[in-house]
Amino acid sequence: MALITRRRFAWQTAFAAALFGCPLRALGSRGVSDADKQNGAPLDAEAIRKLASHIDGNVITPETSEYDAARSIFNRAFDRHPAVIVRCAGPSDVARTLEFAQTKHLPLAVRAGGHSRLGFGMCDGGVVIDLSAMKRVEVDTGKRVARAEAGALVRDLDTATQRFGLATTSGGCPTVGIAGLTLGGGEGRLMEKYGAACDNLLSAQVVTVDGRQVEASPKSNPDLFWAIRGGGGNFGVVTTLEYQLHPVDQVLSGALTYPPGRIPDLLQAFVKFLAGAPDEMDAFAQLLPSEQGRRLKIDVCYCGDPRLGNDLLRPLRAFKPQDDSVKTMSYLEAQTAGGFLAAPVAHFQTNLLLRELSGAAIAAITTAINDAPATCKAIIVPLRGAVSRVNVTDTAFALREPGYEIDIAGVWNTPAAKAEVVRWVQATRDNLQPFGHGVYVNQLGDTSDQLVRSGYGPNYARLVEIKKKYDPNNVLRLNQNIKPDSASNT
């Protein structure tokens, strides 16, 4: 069955209802989570028909052949069944879908790239605003500005801007959506030089829960602009983002992979290397399983003169990596090389922030990785350079203190493996907690009020007040949620 447009939907819904002898209600209620449950009105054929008649995009229900593909998200640990998915064609579709979900008292999810660690882009038994068809990117080379629709992926933004030798901080995985990335802060290979993705956001078009289409910028709704630069999708549905671009052409990029057995020495060398590295140097370390034992891999991307970049890498190459793939390439090539998870898979990931990689912290990390299941890893992301020179209260994104983000993750394909992975990830986080002081909300595979507060630190109280203004009923709650009725103390 084809996707449902407003023209085709009237007869399709009537036929389906007659055939199955039942209303087209929230069939996705199978497996509804406690967080998603609401006493919503059933979605019968007439309700869906009326919705489709006002939508320029496509309306997808459990009866359409595209339903399973449309509800599929990157983290296959979540298998959610929404009652209806609205693949929006523009802001007006977003506004109409927001109104529909609230009128029917149904849970509402917003999907752009579909990479949420907690599967927030889908919900059980509710309504999904799907932005994936809105992915146009326009580049103004004179102003060095990109204007991108919220369904664009990192690869869409990079491909459009690299045609002109330009780029902005946009994450390290090509299939991540730029909207979720940016709204949560946005780490990437250029953050040491040019700041986080949210630091390069010039303005955004937002549909508020009451259906208004507004601009968020330093001059228009500045409180909203402050909040969406790190505060996630708590305040409205962003439909367009405008970014500052920078000249980025050739980079020195690749990885140094070392033999097993030298993780503590290599991490100490990594810390020393970073201390003398300029802002042009992005580097992160991965602690990986292998048949020979745990090993360390250092990924680098240097956006300055490649000859100088090679000179800077001499201390790391002195440890004789068994594989050295670092070479000069286009920034686009570096960006499309892949990320931690190259393909959709069931996974669990969490993180914490460390102010330093002390000897004790390195020992704890080494012990953890030596005990890790074969499908688990840890990633050490330095927080330094331009991203750490922004005042913590200038944006909602609070990761401004120099230090390290430790991402702890694992994948599985059986229930037994899942239990082992989750147990190790949680135990590793707990063991590193004495060295930690916060979290990055975009990389959390679990959620709680305490974790959300920890992610926003001194900005939490202001975020609560802005949430009360723009979404007092917490319609947009399937996210790392800032509750409007939260006590504002941190």
Briefly describe each language-model feature range:
Residues A2-T490:
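Soluble FAD-dependent oxygen oxidases
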